[in-house]
């Protein structure tokens, strides 16, 4: 069973990548399970053509003793199995705790043993790597982590913070960094910035997803790009990315950038923006 996590800043394109990679891997004949670990519960939206009941909602409505696998596992596009952890009501409780509860419930119900997926993908919010959102790292639920980022300074800052969490648990032999997914959707689209960041943290770029209006059109229809435009160039980019990650054997314990290193990278971005728009 191939298991990996996708982390990244909120709104950076994690779910876009996860949905399309899952669809691509399923298209290739693999049985895929996607576990959304984001309180927005939208990780599987394009696979399911809408939202599904979350583990936490079902937990609150039925109680854990009455829950069944079919209450929380749904089958979406290309036969991809979908689960959403969900979160507390706004202003109440801890979203990270929701991830912990969801992961525990999947274990209790024997989801992995019964479904026997070939691939499990965890889609995890990475703005703050607290105890809940770091659960897949702590419990070694996955073999490696992939971080989605753009050239935006705050996205890189979040990616660097995630690397700190991976380093903490990686040094205990629990997890490793597989690489960076470059989402080319920020104002500054400069691969050299990401190359510099990747070199600094001792990792690799797994692939670049360029900006495309096809992705936007697909998501407005609540579809993956693989479903909406299967023969498009951007769909093939997602297929290449999915295969690259599935086959990847090269992992590292990252070396997060220091504050000074981040400042220097930010200055490089500012210089590129100035040159581009002045």
Swiss-Prot record:
**Gene3D superfamilies attached to this UniProt entry:** P-loop containing nucleotide triphosphate hydrolases
Sites of the modification ADP-ribosylarginine? 97
List, alphabetically, the InterPro entries matched. NifH/chlL_CS, NifH/frxC, Nitrogenase_Fe_NifH, P-loop_NTPase
One of the entry's Gene Ontology molecular-function terms is: metal ion binding
Catalysed reaction, written as an equation: N2 + 8 reduced [2Fe-2S]-[ferredoxin] + 16 ATP + 16 H2O = H2 + 8 oxidized [2Fe-2S]-[ferredoxin] + 2 NH4(+) + 16 ADP + 16 phosphate + 6 H(+)
Cofactor(s) it depends on: [4Fe-4S] cluster
Q: What class of enzyme is it?
A: oxidoreductase
Q: How is the cofactor bound?
A: Binds 1 [4Fe-4S] cluster per dimer.
EC numbers for this chain = 1.18.6.1
| PTM summary | The reversible ADP-ribosylation of Arg-97 inactivates the nitrogenase reductase and regulates nitrogenase activity.
Chain residues that bind ATP: 8-15
Question: Which controlled-vocabulary keywords does the entry list?
Answer: 4Fe-4S, ADP-ribosylation, ATP-binding, Iron, Iron-sulfur, Metal-binding, Nitrogen fixation, Nucleotide-binding, Oxidoreductase
Superkingdom field: Archaea
Q: Where does [4Fe-4S] cluster bind?
A: 94, 130
Biological-process GO terms, alphabetical: nitrogen fixation
Described by its record, this protein's role is as follows: The key enzymatic reactions in nitrogen fixation are catalyzed by the nitrogenase complex, which has 2 components: the iron protein and the molybdenum-iron protein.
Whom does it interact with, and what assembly results?
A: Homodimer.
Provide the family line. Belongs to the NifH/BchL/ChlL family.
The protein's matches in NCBIfam families, at most eight in alphabetical order, are given as: nifH, PRK13230.1
This chain belongs to the protein called Nitrogenase iron protein
- Annotated organism of origin: Methanococcus voltae
């Amino acid at each position: 069973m191939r298991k990996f996590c996708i982390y990244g800043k909120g709104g950076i394109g994690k779910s876009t990548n996860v949905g399309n990679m899952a669809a691509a891997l399923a298209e290739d004949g693999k049985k895929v399970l996607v576990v959304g670990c984001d309180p927005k519960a939208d990780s599987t939206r394009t696979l399911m053509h809408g939202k599904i009941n979350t583990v936490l909602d079902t937990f609150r409505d039925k109680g854990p003793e009455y829950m069944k696998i079919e209450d929380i596992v749904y089958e979406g596009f290309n036969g991809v199995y979908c689960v959403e952890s969900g979160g507390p009501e706004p202003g109440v409780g801890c979203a990270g705790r929701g991830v912990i509860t969801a992961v525990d419930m999947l274990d209790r119900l024997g989801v992995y043993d019964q479904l026997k997926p070939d691939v499990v993908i965890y889609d995890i919010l990475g703005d703050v790597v607290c105890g809940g959102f770091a659960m897949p790292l702590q419990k070694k639920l996955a073999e490696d982590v992939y971080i989605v980022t753009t050239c935006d300074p705050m996205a890189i800052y979040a990616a660097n913070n995630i690397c700190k969490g991976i380093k903490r648990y990686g040094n205990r032999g629990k997890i490793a960094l597989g690489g960076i997914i470059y989402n080319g959707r920020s104002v500054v689209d400069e691969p050299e910035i990401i190359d510099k960041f990747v070199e600094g943290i001792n990792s690799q770029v797994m692939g670049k997803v360029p900006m495309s209006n096809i992705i936007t059109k697909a998501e407005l229809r609540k579809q993956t790009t693989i479903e909406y435009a299967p023969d498009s160039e951007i769909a093939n980019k997602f297929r290449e990315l999915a295969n690259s990650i599935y086959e990847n054997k090269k992992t590292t314990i990252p070396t997060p950038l220091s504050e000074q290193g981040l400042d220097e990278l930010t200055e490089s971005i500012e210089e590129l923006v100035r040159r581009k728009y002045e």
